[in-house]
């Protein structure tokens, strides 16, 4: 039996070699032998390059042409103060150019990168420190910039300001690494920080050019006049405080007038209080009398009628009213007659 299987295997191999290895079974044996491994490797490398081009080079910076590309190694985070006193944060990736001199068309930076001048807007979320601040350029520049940063949690906003980034440990022109605890950066590269008043800060446009106010509007306090009238209800004194003097002047005549006025107010209040109490007492007496009369009537008391319309009523009209949906005589009619007869006797 073993000889038969061996002879069959020899016949199959000879037929495969005779047809040049084009048979399906022969090609399977060739694949097992590694003859087509080079083709599979090339196809795998092509797939790898294709998927890497789709998913392997993603950056958080979208460019104008819709393609994703690696940003320059350095950028600049501008902190611009508006003429109205508000702040906004603008992040812009630098363009590889020759460093410009002070007052040139761009903003000089370390490493030959500079900030193109332009108009910027800032989307600021009002609230406590920790809310995001997103800076978006108002018009397309040579490079697009869209970055989200956060308020420094260690620096609370003073007054009505939404956020202020002026840490004491950072000086104008200094570089801050992403490990700084006062600000959370998304990129793992150093950023140059520009402050208002330096050569690297572009001149911001007037506040009217922004789409909306960065800070909420707060009502202003009314202006104080030179003399303010101060009234004290506890002591009944009224003095005039002048802006030049720090004390109020009260004369004895004013004290006597205030005391007499206070006495008049007290007597007036007592009279009103007595009148109210008297009215309440009369109302309570009338209510009690009405309740007593109603109770007597309910227990069968005599009923005196003054209305002329009650003259034509029947003798059974002693406060009893049959329901309108049941006009038949009540079963208690006989009892009422007996009570009326007993009352007359």
From Swiss-Prot:
Major granular component involved in excreted-secreted antigen (ESA) immunity. The keyword Glycosyltransferase does not apply. Residues 1-20 form the signal peptide. This is Dense granule protein 4. O-glycosylated. The chain crosses the membrane at residues 276-296. It is found in: Secreted; Parasitophorous vacuole lumen; Parasitophorous vacuole membrane; Cytoplasmic vesicle, Secretory vesicle. Residues 227-251 have a biased composition (Polar residues). Keywords: Cytoplasmic vesicle, Glycoprotein, Membrane, Secreted, Signal, Transmembrane, Transmembrane helix. Residues 335-345 have a biased composition (Basic and acidic residues). Residues 321-330 have a biased composition (Pro residues).
């Amino acid at each position: 039996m073993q000889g038969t299987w061996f002879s069959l295997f020899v016949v199959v191999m000879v037929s495969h070699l005779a047809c040049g290895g084009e048979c399906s079974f022969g090609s399977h044996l060739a694949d097992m032998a590694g003859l087509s491994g080079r083709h599979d490797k090339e196809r795998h490398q092509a797939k790898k390059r294709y998927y890497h081009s789709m998913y392997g080079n993603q950056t958080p910076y979208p460019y104008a042409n819709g393609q994703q590309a690696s940003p320059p190694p350095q950028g600049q985070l501008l902190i611009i103060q508006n003429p109205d006193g508000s702040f906004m944060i603008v992040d812009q990736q630098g363009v590889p150019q020759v460093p410009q001199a002070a007052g040139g068309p761009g903003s000089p930076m370390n490493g030959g990168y500079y900030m193109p001048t332009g108009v910027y807007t800032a989307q600021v979320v009002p609230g406590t420190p920790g809310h995001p601040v997103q800076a978006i350029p108002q018009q397309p520049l040579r490079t697009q910039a869209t970055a989200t940063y956060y308020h420094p949690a260690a620096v609370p906003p003073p007054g009505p300001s939404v956020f202020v980034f002026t840490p004491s440990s950072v000086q104008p022109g200094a570089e801050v690494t992403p490990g700084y605890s006062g600000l959370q950066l998304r990129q793992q590269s150093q950023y140059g920080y520009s402050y208002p008043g330096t050569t690297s800060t572009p001149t911001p446009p007037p506040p009217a050019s922004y789409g909306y106010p960065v800070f909420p509007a707060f009502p202003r306090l009314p202006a104080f006049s030179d003399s303010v009238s101060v009234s004290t209800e506890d002591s009944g004194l009224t003095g005039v405080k002048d802006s030049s003097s720090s004390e109020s002047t009260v004369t004895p005549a004013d004290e006597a007038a205030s005391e007499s006025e206070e006495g008049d107010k007290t007597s007036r209040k007592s009279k009103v209080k007595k009148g109210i109490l008297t009215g309440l007492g009369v109302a309570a007496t009338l209510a009690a009398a009405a309740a007593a009369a109603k109770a007597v009537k309910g227990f069968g008391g005599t009923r005196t009628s003054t209305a002329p319309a009650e003259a034509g009523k029947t003798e059974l009209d002693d406060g009893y009213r049959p329901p309108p949906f049941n006009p038949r005589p009540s079963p208690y009619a006989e009892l009422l007659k007996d009570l009326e007869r007993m009352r007359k006797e």
